Structures are given as C-alpha cells and as structure tokens.
C-alpha cells in the first residue's frame, strides 16, 4: 500500500470515549503530511495551490485532487468521517526540504518508535547534549554541547495556575509513545482528584509521541497534538514541543543531561 493509505481516526472530545480508542493516531492524511514535513496544513496548501505544486504548469493529473477530494482510504476504521482531505495518496506535491531524516540501521531497537521517527521525518544522527535550558519568557528550549548551542526549539511552558518549576532538574528517563493518565479535575485546578482516564498512545495524545521524565514529580518535556499552539498557548506546568521537535530532542538527551528552567 502507498504511504498515504493508512487508518485515520476521529478523535472524540469526551475523555471517556478517547480512552476507548486503541491509538490516538492521525486524524487525516493532511495532518500526517504536515507533521512529516514539520509544518502546517495551511503552509502545504500554499505550496500546492489548487492541489498541484506551486509553479508547475498544466492541470493536475488524475488522483491529485484539490480541496473537495474525499478520503481515499476505504479501509479506514472511520469510513463515516465527513472530513475531506486536501491531499490524496499518489498525489505529487511540493513540500519543505527538512533533511536529516535518515534512520541508521540497528540504531533504534523499539520498532514502534522507529516507525514514529520515520513518520515524523526525524533521523538518528542527532547531537548528544550536556545541557538544555528552557526560558519561560523567551518560549525557547536551547540545547548545548559544552558551551556550544546546537539546537533551538520553540516551546510552551507553564501558566499562572501551573507555573514552570524554575530551577535545575535531572532527566529520569524517556517513554516513547506513552499512554497518558488524564484527570480533568486536576488539570482544571481542582484540589480533589477526579476520575482518571488512561488515554492511548499516538501523535494526538495530550503528551504527543514522547515523554521525557524529569526529577520533579509529575513534570516532563513532551510533544503535543496541536503543533500550531506551540509558543502561544500555556501548558499545565510541563514543557511542550511539536511532536517532531520532541522526537529530535529525545535523541539528543540522556540521564546525564542537565535541565535548567528559567523565568
């Protein structure tokens, strides 16, 4: 089957129904393409006006439909979905050249994580970093080898209700494609624990594709189901990146990496 033909999922709003899903996978081919090329669906549409690559002469070929094209995956677990994709399997499109997506043979033991890296266009050749510094004011995460800055990511971090825990922390471990225990009462500021829902893993999980666990209990660095909110919306105390940046960062850090949170 082609790269674009896979099962897509309708993600319900209700956490109880989310917990019934096997996986919180991609909702559409459009969303999957945008994550693969580290951008938004809107940018991909701008690069492919009318459903064909910008600057290409002539009309689009068969199978390269535009905005009114319906989903091509008849085997999807959600054949009743009314969402129409702009892009279709087999369509020739223009995309950002993100590079560095080679996964070295034998480098990743977890096959599910290897599949995630491939779907996000993240290669295994990443720098090993000694220190990361998160700036709440700057909405940035800077990664260093010694004194050399080797990576800079935009992040969302903390809120007045759940402030970023300023200070130095250790990395305890990493969880790839983790399930997520979700308690709406706690996240809405309630003092009492409410009903907890165990949400399945996937790119549309509240913590995205990876959780980098910190020595501060309940706090971590993780991905997101809503990449367009990074750098804009606040988070529940944790540090949130796009899924592709979180996956890159996971390949850079280890338990010996120093973590500093600044105001």
Please place each PLM-identified region on the residue numbering.
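Primarily a LysM-type cell-wall glycan-binding module
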Residues: 1-46
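Extracellular LysM carbohydrate-binding repeats and other cell-envelope/extracellular binding modules
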Residues: 1-5, 43-112
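Second-shell loop/turn segments in exported
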Residues: 16-34, 80-82, 127-131, 198-202, ...
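N-terminal post-signal-peptidase region of extra-cytosolic proteins
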Residues: 30, 46-49, 65-82, 115-130, ...
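Sec-exported extracytoplasmic/periplasmic mature domains
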Residues: 35-53, 98, 146, 247, ...
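Exported/periplasmic cell-wall-interacting domains
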Residues: 53, 185-263
């Amino acid at each position: 089957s082609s790269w674009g033909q896979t099962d897509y999922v309708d993600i319900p709003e209700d956490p109880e129904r989310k917990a019934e899903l096997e996986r919180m996978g991609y909702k559409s081919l459009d969303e999957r393409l945008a994550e693969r090329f580290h951008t938004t669906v809107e940018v991909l549409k701008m690069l492919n006006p009318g459903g064909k690559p910008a600057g290409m002469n002539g009309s689009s070929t068969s199978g390269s439909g535009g905005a009114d094209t319906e989903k091509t995956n008849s085997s999807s677990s959600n054949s009743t979905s009314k969402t129409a994709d702009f892009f279709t399997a087999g369509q020739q499109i223009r995309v950002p050249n993100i590079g560095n997506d080679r996964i070295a043979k034998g480098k990743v033991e977890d096959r599910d994580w290897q599949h995630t890296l491939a779907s996000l266009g993240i290669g295994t050749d990443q720098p090993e970093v000694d220190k990361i510094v998160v700036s709440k004011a700057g909405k940035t995460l800077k990664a260093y080898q010694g004194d050399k800055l080797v990576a800079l990511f935009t992040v969302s971090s903390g809120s007045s209700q759940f402030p970023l825990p300023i200070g130095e922390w250790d990395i305890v471990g990493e969880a790839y494609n983790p399930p997520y225990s979700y308690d709406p009462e706690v996240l809405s500021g309630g003092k009492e624990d409410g009903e907890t829902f165990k949400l399945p893993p996937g790119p549309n999980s509240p913590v995205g594709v990876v959780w980098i666990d910190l020595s501060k209990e309940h706090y971590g660095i993780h991905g997101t189901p809503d990449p367009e909110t990074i750098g804009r919306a606040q988070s529940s105390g944790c540090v949130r990146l796009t899924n592709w940046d979180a996956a890159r960062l996971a390949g850079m850090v280890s338990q010996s990496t120093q973590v500093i949170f600044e105001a």
